Amino acid sequence: MQHKTQLTLSFLLSQVLLLACAEDLECTPGFQQKVFYIEQPFEFTEDQPILNLVFDDCKGNNKLNFEVSNPDFKVEHDGSLVALKNVSEAGRALFVHARSEHAEDMAEILIVGADEKHDALKEIFKIEGNLGIPRQKRAILATPILIPENQRPPFPRSVGKVIRSEGTEGAKFRLSGKGVDQDPKGIFRINEISGDVSVTRPLDREAIANYELEVEVTDLSGKIIDGPVRLDISVIDQNDNRPMFKEGPYVGHVMEGSPTGTTVMRMTAFDADDPSTDNALLRYNILKQTPTKPSPNMFYIDPEKGDIVTVVSPVLLDRETMETPKYELVIEAKDMGGHDVGLTGTATATILIDDKNDHPPEFTKKEFQATVKEGVTGVIVNLTVGDRDDPATGAWRAVYTIINGNPGQSFEIHTNPQTNEGMLSVVKPLDYEISAFHTLLIKVENEDPLIPDIAYGPSSTATVQITVEDVNEGPVFHPNPMTVTKQENIPIGSIVLTVNATDPDTLQHQTIRYSVYKDPASWLEINPTNGTVATTAVLDRESPHVQDNKYTALFLAIDSGNPPATGTGTLHITLEDVNDNVPSLYPTLAKVCDDAKDLRVVVLGASDKDLHPNTDPFKFELSKQSGPEKLWRINKLNNTHAQVVLLQNLKKANYNIPISVTDSGKPPLTNNTELKLQVCSCKKSRMDCSASDALHISMTLILLSLFSLFCL
């Protein structure tokens, strides 16, 4: 059929040419038909005629010679174009050069695909200047060359031919470009005389698919006389690359219960062969599915796109009934459009069946029991639930709620993140005497909402029965802490207060005894029976055991239980001040030069441990002695300070000045004390206070004092 089509195309073209040239009856040297269209067959068969070429030099065609651009073809003497071997790829065109003693010409054979026949016929019937008009001659004919990759030796191997219309006498061909004199060098070469192009080693289309060379014709001296013209060499792809999956790992997810035909993922492979040929035309197939239940054909892969889709019903796509939620598919990609001769590559697709919340959590039993001692807090029971959904997801994680029986908010429940159990805790201590039993109603839900048409049922609620055990609780003081105000220095044995403690265990009718637990100053005692607290020592507000006027003591209340329980009470005594401390004077030592110009010796201050109004203003006075009053005096500065002033310069010596200071308390308290005054000699900024004359001066003062007393 293909041969008939070729003949039809050639016949039509020849008829058109004959019609176009019918008026020209003179012989025109050359090919009588210059353009041919033939349909690309699956293969050109060796020695089978392809078409007939008619050449006439109008002189008898003596010494007629034909040259074909592709060395796999030749033209017989009768003009028949034949293949020298079986040829599956001849390119898009063949050029035939014919030469005799009197004429030469070029014919072009265009090879078209089956889908191009219509366009070829249109070209044949197109009325244009090319019909009947001799084609312009080409000086160098360099038709494209096609070379299959991965050819086997021997090399070099002839792959094409360059033709010069003028012949090559006195001239030679020269080839240049990438693959000749540029890297990679030495792949191609040309016979300088015949124009035969040869390849020297196997080619790899995936490395270089096309070579663009230049052909020139030079004279024997190397001068270019024709060209350059471009020579295209294309490497014909062979199926020498397997499909490869490069984007792994391949993991897809599909929700359980998804409709049949749900797309899970896409698997695509890469083939390094020519994408325009079947060598890279891939088809996909599932070789193996693991596991094979509930169906050995859970999934389908689109052979062209590589899309993996579900093919089972939503009922079978149930995660909870599956042997495992993970499926592994061995995917095969085969080139050559999936034909048996194609090369293959495989990869594994992992498909995970994702969970949806189609199973509510359910308690493992309807009623749980718990026992807790009164007064204790913490977890008292773990509530267990079952959920068939995927663990560690929101469809599995439980959320617990106390919906009844917790008016006092004594209980809380939280989820154990590892076990999903509900941890029920007492957060406020329970009292046996108030209630010995508690009943809680607990509800469990999921973090994620249930899917439509699924609801929480009776198994999603449970009852917890809690029994409170009685324990011997310690007595409780009322109030606690206790506060009282007392004046310091009250008589020993004075009653401070009576403490009161009660036993929470009202049903046990226990007795209570009291004792002192902590009394830092040992000032107090307590009656063990009635709780009366009395003083055993004088209360002193100025004691180091008193802080901010408060004294703190602790007492114990002990019941008669077995074993006994103890309660602790705190007593704060606020002490009121009384004037029981004399003022103190400072400083007690002063120094002055014997020739001082400023006779103001020192400023005295007074302080008192008591509180107002038992402190300042203070009264400063010299003691009632006539002798000292003649030597110095005291001037009041303010409520807390006074100044000692000399009445005259004194000789170097140590003097003791008797001074009294009195507070403002009722009654006031006076402190009689002495100020030691050192009179020193001062020379050149040095003060000498050695007491060489101190004994003399002191004795003089003593004698003067005695004399004044005697005279009285």
UniProtKB/Swiss-Prot annotation:
Single GO term (MF): beta-catenin binding
Any one GO CC term of this protein is:
side of membrane
Instruction: Point out the signal peptide segment.
Output: 1-22
Membrane topology, as annotated, equals: Lipid-anchor; GPI-anchor
GO biological-process terms attached to the record? adherens junction organization; calcium-dependent cell-cell adhesion via plasma membrane cell adhesion molecules; cell migration; cell morphogenesis; cell-cell adhesion mediated by cadherin; cell-cell junction assembly; homophilic cell adhesion via plasma membrane adhesion molecules
Q: Which residues carry attached sugars according to the database record?
A: N86, N382, N500, N530, N638, N671
Domain Cadherin positions: 143-245, 246-363, 364-477, 478-585, 586-680
- Using the UniProt record, give the first listed, main subcellular location: membrane
Question: InterPro entries recorded for this chain?
Answer: Cadherin, Cadherin-like_dom, Cadherin-like_sf, Cadherin_CS, Cadherin_pro_dom
Kindly list the residues that the UniProt entry marks as GPI-anchor amidated aspartate lipid attachment points. D693
Protein name per the record: Cadherin-13
The lineage, from the top, is: Eukaryota, Metazoa, Chordata, Craniata, Vertebrata
Tell me where in or outside the cell this protein is found: Cell membrane; Cytoplasm
Q: Which organism is it from?
A: Gallus gallus
Q: Domain remarks in the entry?
A: Three calcium ions are usually bound at the interface of each cadherin domain and rigidify the connections, imparting a strong curvature to the full-length ectodomain.
Positions of the propeptide removed during maturation? 23-138, 694-712
- Write down the superkingdom of origin: Eukaryota
* Biological role stated in the UniProt entry: Cadherins are calcium-dependent cell adhesion proteins. They preferentially interact with themselves in a homophilic manner in connecting cells; cadherins may thus contribute to the sorting of heterogeneous cell types. May act as a negative regulator of neural cell growth.
Going by the UniProt record, its keywords in alphabetical order are: Calcium, Cell adhesion, Cell membrane, Cleavage on pair of basic residues, Cytoplasm, Glycoprotein, GPI-anchor, Lipoprotein, Membrane, Metal-binding, Repeat, Signal
Q: Describe tissue expression.
A: Neural tissues. Also found in muscles; kidney and retina.
Subunit info here reads: By contrast to classical cadherins, homodimerization in trans is not mediated by cadherin EC1 domain strand-swapping, but instead through a homophilic adhesive interface which joins two elongated EC1-EC2 domains through a region near their Ca2+-binding sites to form a tetrahedral, X-like shape.
